[in-house]
Amino acid sequence: MINDVISPEFDENGRAMRRIRSFVRRQGRLTKGQQLALDNYWPVMGVEYQPTPVDFTALFGREAPVVLEIGFGMGTSLVTMAASNPQQNFLGIEVHSPGVGACLASAHEAGLNNLRVMCHDAVEVLENMIPDSSLDMVQLFFPDPWHKARHNKRRIVQAPFVELVKSKLKVGGVFHMATDWQHYAEHMLEVMSGANGYRNLSEQNDYVPRPDSRPLTKFELRGQRLGHGVWDLMFERKE
């Protein structure tokens, strides 16, 4: 599973220079069902990008904890979580329109009213649309590991990005990551352990067991049968 976001490159002073994409945009062909969902359900559940902070109470029509998922793929897990947690509001970001269409179709079939989706650069959304200290959780599941050394800078989990995420989390909010690439898990752990203002929720200060809140995907189950590992990391904003 490859999730899709955009990661900026920063200089030594933390200034954004040019954007390094952590994905290759391959839109693919929309199925009839995906196109139908985009046509019919985007006006209800879709959120257009705008460079101004969003009002979550107005967006969802109620006040409730907000969970942001970055790169939801086809939306299977996101829809499952939203259906299982009606007391929470969910906002998903995905740059590939077939995935957005599939998610909208599943969400409509499930009768969800606590889910909204965006089709845009996740970093821009975080920077410009998400109010500071507004999120209860940020989820990043199975992002592209960019396993070749020359591509490591494309990985979304870098020090400036985790600082940006922290600024959007409430104190006590959690950044939850999962990957099936051990080297990327080690990279995530190194970056997060070096970031100020986070507390690792692992008792051993490394990885946590998969929480029940993160559904097992078909992809993950297949990997387990093949003996592949999966690493979950959960870090709480403490200040």
Swiss-Prot record:
GO MF, any single term: tRNA (guanine(46)-N7)-methyltransferase activity
Enzyme class: transferase
EC number: 2.1.1.33
UniProt keyword terms in alphabetical order: Methyltransferase, S-adenosyl-L-methionine, Transferase, tRNA processing
GO CC terms of this entry: tRNA methyltransferase complex
Active site (catalytic residues): 144
Residues involved in substrate binding: 148, 180, 217-220
Database matches in CDD domains: AdoMet_MTases
Spans traversing the lipid bilayer: none
Pathway: tRNA modification; N(7)-methylguanine-tRNA biosynthesis
InterPro entries assigned: SAM-dependent_MTases_sf, tRNA_(Gua-N-7)_MeTrfase_Trmb, tRNA_methyltr_TrmB_bact
UniProt KW Transferase keyword: yes
Region feature (Interaction with RNA): 150-155
A Pfam family matched in the record: Methyltransf_4
Binding site for S-adenosyl-L-methionine: 69, 94, 121, 144
Reactions catalysed, as given in the entry: guanosine(46) in tRNA + S-adenosyl-L-methionine = N(7)-methylguanosine(46) in tRNA + S-adenosyl-L-homocysteine
Function (record text): Catalyzes the formation of N(7)-methylguanine at position 46 (m7G46) in tRNA.
NCBIfam families: tRNA (guanosine(46)-N7)-methyltransferase TrmB
Protein family according to the UniProt entry: Belongs to the class I-like SAM-binding methyltransferase superfamily. TrmB family.
Subunit details: Monomer.
The protein's name: tRNA (guanine-N(7)-)-methyltransferase
Taxonomic source organism: Yersinia enterocolitica serotype O:8 / biotype 1B (strain NCTC 13174 / 8081)
The encoding gene: trmB
